[in-house]
C-alpha cells in the first residue's frame, strides 16, 4: 500500500516537513509495511527514521532537501514508537556509537529489516552541505543516509548531492544492494563497516572525498561503476571482495571540502578551483580499531578496471597511521587493469606476522610525465609479489625497493631491478 506524504500534511515550503514525513513512515510501519511516496517538489526536512518493511519511494522530480540547521537531525533520539536505549553503555568512538551527533543523518535506520530507498530518474536527496561548527573537522554536518544494525537493505535510482558528510554510512548490517545510485559532491560516496553480503553496481560516485570506503566487510561485489574523487578511489578492506568493470578518473570534479577556507565551509560552498582536486591511491588499505576485524583481509580481486590520473596504484603503510594499524591485507590481485599517470611508487608495507601476497596479472601501468624515474614499488614485510604480463610505459628505471626479504616472481619480474631501500 502507498502512503503519500502530502496526505499527511507535507507541503512544498521553506518550513520543515519532518513531522509529516515521519508520520507517513510511522503509519506505514504500523500497518505492516508498504511504500511512503515522495511526489515531485522540494520538501525540506530534518532527520527522518526509516522503519522495518518500509520503502521510501521518490517520484521523478521529488527532492528531499535537508535543513540548514544541524540540530534538526537529532529528533530520532526522542522516538517513542521504537524507543532507543540511550542509557545502555555506549562506544567511546563517535563513529561507532549509532546515537552520536557524528552519526546523525537525513535518513536514519536502526535495528530495521527489509528497508528500501528507491528513486525514479530525476529524484534527489540534497544535503545542502549543512554546516556544523561542532562537527567533524569543525564543519561537517549529518550524513545523508545512516544505517546501523539492519538487514535486507535495497537502494536504487536516486541522486545524492551536497551531502554534509558521507552519502551512505552503513554499519553492522547484512544483505545490502545499491543499484543505479549517483552521488555528486559532498564527502565519501559509499561507506560500509562490519557488513556482510554487499552488492554495489551501475553507480556513479563523483565525490569530494573517497568513492568507496570501509573495512571488516565480507562478500562484497562492486561493479560497473563510474568513479571520480579528491581522495582515494577505494579506501577499503575486507574478505572475499570482487571489484570489476569500473572506470576511475582524475582530476576530481569536486574538490576536497577540507581544503576550503573556514569562511567557504560556513557558507556551504561546494567546491572552488583552489580546492584539492587530485586523487591519491587507486586502492588504499584501511583497517583501524573502530571494529574488531573478524577475518584476515584478503581474497580481493580487482579486474577489468581502468584508473586514469591516480597518484598511486596501491598503498598499504601498515602500522604507520592510525587508519592502517589493525590487520594488514594478506592477499590482493589486480587482473586485466590499466593505470595511467601514476607518479608515486606503490607502497606495500605489510606485517611480519601476516605478510602480503600482492599480484598483478595482465596489467598496464604508465608513469606521469615528469615522473619517469620513479620506483615501481616500495616493499616491506611481504610474502610474494607476483608480476605476470605487466606492461610499463614512460618508466626509465622501474626498480623495486625492498626493506625486507620476500619472493618476487612471475614472467615480468626480470623487468624490475630489485634494490635495497636507502633513506634519502
Q: What is each model feature region?
A:
Residues 1-424:
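Extracellular/periplasmic carbohydrate-active domains that bind, remodel
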Amino acid at each position: 500500500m502507498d502512503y503519500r506524504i502530502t496526505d499527511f500534511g507535507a507541503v512544498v515550503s521553506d518550513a520543515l516537513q519532518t513531522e509529516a514525513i515521519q508520520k507517513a513512515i510511522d503509519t506505514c510501519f504500523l500497518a505492516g509495511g508498504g511504500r511512503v511516496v515522495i511526489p515531485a517538489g522540494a520538501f525540506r526536512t530534518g532527520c527522518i527514521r526509516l522503519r522495518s518493511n518500509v520503502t521510501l519511494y521518490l517520484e521523478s522530480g521529488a527532492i528531499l532537501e535537508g535543513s540548514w540547521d544541524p540540530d534538526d537531525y537529532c529528533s530520532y533520539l526522542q522516538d517513542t514508537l521504537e524507543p532507543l536505549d540511550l542509557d545502555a553503555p555506549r562506544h567511546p568512538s563517535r563513529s561507532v556509537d549509532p546515537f552520536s551527533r557524528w552519526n546523525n543523518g537525513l535518513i536514519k535506520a536502526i535495528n530495521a529489516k527489509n528497508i528500501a530507498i528507491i528513486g525514479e530518474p530525476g529524484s534527489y536527496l540534497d544535503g545542502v552541505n549543512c554546516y556544523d561548527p561542532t562537527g567533524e573537522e569543525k564543519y561537517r554536518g549529518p550524513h545523508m543516509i545512516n544505517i546501523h544494525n539492519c538487514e535486507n537493505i535495497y537502494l536504487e535510482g536516486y541522486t545524492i548531492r551536497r551531502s554534509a558528510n558521507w552519502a551512505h554510512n552503513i554499519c553492522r548490517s547484512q544483505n545490502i544492494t545499491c543499484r543505479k545510485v549517483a552521488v555528486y559532491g559532498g564527502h565519501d560516496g559509499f561507506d560500509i563497516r562490519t557488513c556482510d553480503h554487499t552488492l554495489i553496481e551501475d553507480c556513479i560516485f563523483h565525490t569530494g572525498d573517497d568513492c568507496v570506503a570501509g573495512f571488516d566487510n565480507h562478500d562484497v561485489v562492486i561493479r560497473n561503476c563510474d568513479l571520480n574523487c579528491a581522495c582515494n578511489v577505494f579506501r577499503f578492506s575486507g574478505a572475499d571482495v570482487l571489484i570489476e568493470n569500473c572506470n576511475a578518473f582524475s582530476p576530481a570534479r569536486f574538490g576536497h571540502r577540507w581544503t576550503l577556507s573556514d569562511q567557504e565551509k560556513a557558507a556551504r560552498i561546494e567546491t572552488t578551483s583552489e580546492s584539492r582536486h587530485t586523487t591519491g591511491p587507486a586502492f588504499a588499505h584501511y583497517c583501524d580499531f573502530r571494529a574488531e576485524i573478524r577475518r584476515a583481509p584478503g581474497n580481493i580481486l580487482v579486474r577489468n578496471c581502468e584508473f586514469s590520473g591516480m597518484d598511486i596504484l596501491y598503498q598499504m603503510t601498515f602500522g604507520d597511521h592510525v587508519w592502517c594499524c589493525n590487520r594488514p591485507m594478506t592477499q590482493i590481485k589486480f587482473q586485466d587493469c590499466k593505470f595511467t599517470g601514476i607518479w608515486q611508487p606503490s607502497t606495500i608495507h605489510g606485517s611480519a606476522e601476516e605478510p602480503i601476497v600482492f599480484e598483478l596479472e595482465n596489467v598496464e601501468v604508465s608513469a606521469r610525465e615528469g615522473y619517469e624515474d620513479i620506483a615501481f614499488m616500495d616493499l616491506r614485510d611481504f610474502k610474494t609479489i607476483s608480476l605476470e604480463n605487466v606492461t610499463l610505459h614512460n618508466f626509465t628505471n622501474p626498480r623495486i625497493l625492498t626493506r625486507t626479504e620476500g619472493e618476487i616472481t612471475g614472467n615480468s619480474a626480470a623487468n624490475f631491478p630489485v634494490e635495497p631501500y636507502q633513506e634519502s
